[in-house]
């Protein structure tokens, strides 16, 4: 069984390694494009002097996309081991992992064509052919898709705080020589990340939780179900009592979402969750929670990340 601290450390390694790889790939593509686009206007000797640099950039790039496969698989294998045996790993998380690996493999499958085209262009100091331009554009698109797949993968595991960290890394990257990501595009990327973070924290904040709130016995009141008002502290270590003074149409789904997202990977019986309500109208919430959690075995989910400053949904 993994420890939360070890799990967070793994995610941090994963985040830094991959985001830097993606940024380097984009920078290399920009450098290669610069060599090829400038080659036609150079004198022959000037061009020859850059052939080696151009080919080295191609080689590093191809090695980079090849290395991504083994690097990512290594991290994912470690992630599986830390999460526990296969029966205890949430099926949704597994799907995310396999989807992410698939997006990486889609880049690797094209590496032979990329290498051949780029090497040929380097040697002849020629500008990129229409075919090569399409290949380069496709590569950039795939890399950016990987970045977003990766961010949302981590977002699903660690909550909104991962977007702050990823945003910090992106903000520190230097894309001025990439020939592709302009400062304006970089700004748009950051705006998107923080917009997603803001939305997840404010438009869906039926509950706002911090790690320090996961202790002692807690009772949630009516205000906890109303967005943009007081947060609700829940203790999910062994027993949780939820006291609702009134019900809303989506109250069941929000309570269920909390349990599915932040419960330790134990069965519902082991947790001995207890639900108490003030009004008869909310008795349906109890049925919804028990049926859905137990029916699809969603009681086995990830432990809350104690290092996140705030988690909301």
Swiss-Prot record:
It is a multi-pass membrane protein. It comes from the Eukaryota. It is found in: Mitochondrion inner membrane. Has a role in meiosis. One of its GO terms (biological process) is meiotic cell cycle. Its main location: mitochondrion. The chain crosses the membrane at residues 147-167, 178-198. Keywords: Meiosis, Membrane, Mitochondrion, Mitochondrion inner membrane, Transit peptide, Transmembrane, Transmembrane helix. It comes from Schizosaccharomyces pombe (strain 972 / ATCC 24843) (Fission yeast). This is Meiotically up-regulated gene 100 protein, mitochondrial. GO terms for cellular component: mitochondrial inner membrane; mitochondrion.
């Amino acid at each position: 069984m993994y420890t939360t601290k070890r799990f967070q450390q793994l995610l941090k390694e994963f985040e830094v390694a991959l985001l830097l790889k993606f940024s380097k790939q984009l920078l290399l593509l920009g450098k290669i494009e610069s060599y090829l686009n400038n080659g036609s206007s150079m004198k022959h000797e000037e061009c020859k002097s850059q052939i080696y640099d151009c080919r080295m950039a191609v080689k590093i790039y191809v090695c980079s996309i090849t290395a991504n496969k083994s690097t990512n698989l290594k991290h994912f294998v470690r992630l599986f081991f830390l999460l526990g045996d296969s029966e205890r790993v949430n099926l949704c998380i597994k799907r995310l992992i396999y989807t992410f690996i698939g997006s990486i493999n889609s880049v690797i499958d094209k590496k032979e064509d990329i290498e051949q085209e780029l090497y040929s262009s380097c040697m002849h100091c020629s500008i990129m052919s229409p075919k090569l331009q399409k290949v380069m554009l496709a590569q950039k698109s795939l890399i950016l898709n990987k970045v977003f797949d990766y961010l949302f993968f981590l977002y699903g595991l660690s909550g909104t705080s991962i977007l702050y960290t990823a945003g910090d890394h992106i903000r520190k990257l230097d894309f001025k020589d990439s020939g592709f990501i302009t400062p304006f595009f970089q700004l748009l990327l950051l705006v998107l990340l923080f917009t997603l973070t803001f939305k997840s924290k404010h438009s869906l904040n039926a509950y706002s939780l911090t790690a320090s709130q996961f202790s002692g016995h807690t009772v949630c009141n009516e205000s906890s179900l109303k967005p943009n008002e007081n947060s609700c502290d829940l203790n999910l270590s062994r027993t949780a009592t939820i006291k609702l003074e009134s019900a809303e149409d989506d109250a069941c789904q929000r309570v269920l979402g909390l349990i599915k997202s932040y419960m330790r990977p134990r069965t519902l019986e082991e947790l001995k969750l207890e639900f108490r309500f003030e009004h008869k109208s909310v008795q349906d919430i109890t049925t919804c929670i028990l049926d859905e959690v137990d029916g699809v075995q969603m009681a086995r989910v990830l432990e809350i990340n104690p290092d996140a400053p705030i988690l909301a949904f």
